[in-house]
């Protein structure tokens, strides 16, 4: 096969050399015209790349020094000859800790590289990831044209991994235009721009692989855009743009067992970035409002168990007293299907979107309750930051001692053994089970009837004090 290919190539070369000068010129012109008509990202990138910057950071962080055996601590005190100038042990953690290396904290300097995006040219605002500039004492920004500026911190939010810095004495900057990230669809083209490994501005392309990704860190507000555009170390804080050159996300994380790119990258949606940075500009921080609910994802099995005619949404398992949700009349067992007229795909998506909204924001939530669509209006209250035991999904309810409460008043939990499945799902002494899988439970016999059907998901309706909650298990 190789010989045939080479022969054909040689033949084509011979014929080409035999062409007249006029024919050769025509061929060259045709080739040039074809090249000019080929689609390219270059015109868009020429406009966008000046708004993407490289960020160099210097800072210090506290690290724990190793704890040495007690018998050796006397030899490594501040006055010890082992810790004096010229000693090979002087720079060791045992001498640097100041207390004989007994496990105390020590300040350690670091340098880091990342990327950022200019969102306000006049004021010099640059958005990046919190993990790029966290603990920074010196922040320097380099533009695509090589100019360098000092920058200062404006605000940061570890829970969303967004930070806002400001270029000092900005001149002739180019700001990026933000797109509506809610309009994104799986399959839309994406372009990632950043500074991987400190190489300088680099461009990669791909598509939107998925929307509404979460679960990287359960405590954070996550509603990621997933893309297969290559995102590597140093790309953090860089831009994810559409083919119009508009910002659709801030690159923030990759899923990579060995630290390299395998085509699974995550970006924070531009609408989320817009809400957070506007608060940082105004307050220097994010002042979150909260709904005051606990919940979980609505999947097909839970929908079947709860007899809900929906496949996607946020299932409300508990409403906190005196919260925004409680005042609006939201109840345990409701399914939140929309926020301000836009569909809600999961509890994580609801949490992330509400988590970017400031105190006092007015919302309209679409609910599915008893098979009917209900809309409620509410105003977000300030986050209480109270830690509430959430209801998780575990197997079984073994470990709970129960008895009938009066005549047909439900099943009361008399005791819960520590470490048992009943304790794990959140059952507590004094709880009263009044329903299971949307069926009323008046006594143990009725509860046993539901359990004997061996449902794939069990949703217990619990009366706890003055509140009604749901505990979910499968």
From Swiss-Prot:
NCBIfam families: degP_htrA_DO (TIGR02037), PRK10942.1 (NF008189). Optimum temperature is around 55 degrees Celsius. In the range from 37 to 55 degrees Celsius, the proteolytic activity rapidly increases with temperature. Belongs to the peptidase S1C family. It is an enzyme of class 3 (hydrolase). Disulfide bonds join 83-95. One of its GO terms (molecular function) is peptidase activity. It is found in: Cell inner membrane. DegP is indispensable for bacterial survival at temperatures above 42 degrees Celsius, however is also able to digest its natural substrates in a reducing environment at temperatures as low as 20 degrees Celsius. Disruption phenotype: Decreased induction of Cpx two-component regulatory system. Increased accumulation of periplasmic accessory protein CpxP, increased accumulation and toxicity of overexpressed, misfolded periplasmic proteins. Increased resistance to hydroxyurea, probably due to decreased degradation of misfolded proteins which eventually leads to decreased OH radical formation. Changing residue 262 to N: Stimulates the proteolytic activity at low temperatures (20-30 degrees Celsius), whereas at higher temperatures (above 35 degrees Celsius), the proteolytic activity is less efficient. Its main location: membrane. Its EC number is 3.4.21.107. Induction: By heat shock. Transcriptionally up-regulated by sigma-E factor and the Cpx two-component signal transduction pathway. Residues 1-26 form the signal peptide. This is Periplasmic serine endoprotease DegP. Inhibited by diisopropylfluorophosphate (DFP). Substrate binds at residues 58, 131, 161, 234-236, 252-256, 291-295. DegP can reversibly switch between different oligomeric forms that represent inactive (6-mer) and active (12- and 24-mer) protease states. Substrate binding triggers the conversion of the resting DegP trimer and hexamer into catalytically active 12- and 24-mers. The conversion of 6-mer (DegP6) into 12-mer (DegP12) or 24-mer (DegP24) is crucial in regulating protease activity. GO terms for biological process: chaperone-mediated protein folding; protein folding; protein quality control for misfolded or incompletely synthesized proteins; proteolysis; response to heat; response to oxidative stress; response to temperature stimulus. It comes from Escherichia coli (strain K12). It catalyses: Acts on substrates that are at least partially unfolded. The cleavage site P1 residue is normally between a pair of hydrophobic residues, such as Val-|-Val. DegP acts as a chaperone at low temperatures but switches to a peptidase (heat shock protein) at higher temperatures. Degrades transiently denatured and unfolded or misfolded proteins which accumulate in the periplasm following heat shock or other stress conditions. DegP is efficient with Val-Xaa and Ile-Xaa peptide bonds, suggesting a preference for beta-branched side chain amino acids. Only unfolded proteins devoid of disulfide bonds appear capable of being cleaved, thereby preventing non-specific proteolysis of folded proteins. GO terms for cellular component: outer membrane-bounded periplasmic space; periplasmic space; plasma membrane. Residues 280-371, 377-466 form the PDZ domain. The active site is at 131 (charge relay system), 161 (charge relay system), 236 (charge relay system). It is a peripheral membrane protein. Keywords: Cell inner membrane, Cell membrane, Disulfide bond, Hydrolase, Membrane, Protease, Repeat, Serine protease, Signal, Stress response.
């Amino acid at each position: 096969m190789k010989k045939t290919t080479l022969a054909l190539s040689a033949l084509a070369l011979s014929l080409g050399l035999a062409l007249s000068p006029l024919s050769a010129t025509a061929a060259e012109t045709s080739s040039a015209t074809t090249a000019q008509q080929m689609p390219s990202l270059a015109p868009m990138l020429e406009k966008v790349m000046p708004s993407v910057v490289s960020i160099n950071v210097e800072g210090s962080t506290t690290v724990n020094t190793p704890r040495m055996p007690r018998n050796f601590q006397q030899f490594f005190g501040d006055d010890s000859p082992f810790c004096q100038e010229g000693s090979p042990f002087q720079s060791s953690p045992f001498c640097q800790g100041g207390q004989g290396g007994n496990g105390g904290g020590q300040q350690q300097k670091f340098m880091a590289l990342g990327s950022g995006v200019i969102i306000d040219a006049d004021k010099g605002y640059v958005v990046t990831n919190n993990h790029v500039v966290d603990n920074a004492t010196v922040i320097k920004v380099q533009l695509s044209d090589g100019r360098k500026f000092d920058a200062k911190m404006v605000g940061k939010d570890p829970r969303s991994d967004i930070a806002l810095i400001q270029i000092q004495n900005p001149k002739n900057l180019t700001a990026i235009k933000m797109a509506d990230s809610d309009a994104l669809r799986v399959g839309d083209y994406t372009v990632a721009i950043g500074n991987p490994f400190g190489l300088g501005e680099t461009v990669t392309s791909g598509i939107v692989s998925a929307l509404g990704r979460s679960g990287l860190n359960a405590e954070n507000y996550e509603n990621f855009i997933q893309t297969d555009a290559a995102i590597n170390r140093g790309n953090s804080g860089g831009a994810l743009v559409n083919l119009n050159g508009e910002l659709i996300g801030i690159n923030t994380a990759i899923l990579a067992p060995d630290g390299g790119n395998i085509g699974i990258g995550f970006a924070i949606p531009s609408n989320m970035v817009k809400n957070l940075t506007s608060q940082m500009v105004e307050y220097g921080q994010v002042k979150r409002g909260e709904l005051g609910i606990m919940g979980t994802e609505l999947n097909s099995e839970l929908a079947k168990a709860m007899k809900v005619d929906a496949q996607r949404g946020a299932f409300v398992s508990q409403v906190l007293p005196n919260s925004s949700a409680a005042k609006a009349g939201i109840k345990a067992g409701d399914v939140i299907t929309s926020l301000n007229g836009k569909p809600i795909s999961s509890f994580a998506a609801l949490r992330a979107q509400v988590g970017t909204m400031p105190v006092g924001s007015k919302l309209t939530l679409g609910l599915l309750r008893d098979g009917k669509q209900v809309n409620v209006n509410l105003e977000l209250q300030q986050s209480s930051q109270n830690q509430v035991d959430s209801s998780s999904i575990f197997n079984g309810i073994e470990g709970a001692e129960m008895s009938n409460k009066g005549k047909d008043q439900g099943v009361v939990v008399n005791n819960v053994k520590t470490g048992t499945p009943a304790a794990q799902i959140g059952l507590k002494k004094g709880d009263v089970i009044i329903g299971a899988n949307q069926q009323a439970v008046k006594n143990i016999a009725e509860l046993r009837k539901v359990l004997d059907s061996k449902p794939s998901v069990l949703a217990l309706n619990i009366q706890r004090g003055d509140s009604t909650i749901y505990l979910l298990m499968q």
